[in-house]
Amino acid sequence: MKKIILIVSILASTLVASAQNTSLSYIEKFKDNAIRIMHETGVPASIVLAAAMHESACGNSNIAQKLNNQFGVKGGGKNFYYKNNKKVSTQYKKYDSVMDSFQDFADIMTSRKQFCHLTDELTHYDYVGWAKGIQHSGYCSSHKWAAQVLNIIHKYQLNLYDESPADPTQLAANPQ
């Protein structure tokens, strides 16, 4: 019995470590793009990253892998992808690249009537206000969405990216 408990514990810790590595590699891969989008649109980099991580399971969901859709955005007509050699029809939007998906999320936040008030009311430092505002404006049906996104931000300290300068060379020029 002790051996079984030990094996289960080892497997569980391996899975947690694997998920952590997936999250960290996703952040590393897309943080600079999220920072650029923040400086162009005012949507916090932490919100862009955490929402993408949450909605796409760090890029591992079917729609993230097959459609480059990191945010679960619907629209764009009928799209298709293949799963187990079968054609699957979907209402989710297809993007040419992950970056196009990130950019579209920021465009949705800044141009759609239900969300654009957030850029007027909040700074890119107020990630808590953004998460709650996005949820209250109808982005998702889950009443836990903001809390889940905020948990990701806190767990990985994504709010530190909201402090990043527009020009990455400024980081080296202004050491702290």
Regions found by a protein language model. Name each.
Residues 16-176:
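Catalytic cores of secreted/periplasmic lytic hydrolases that degrade extracellular macromolecules
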Residues 4-14:
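Sec-dependent N-terminal signal peptides
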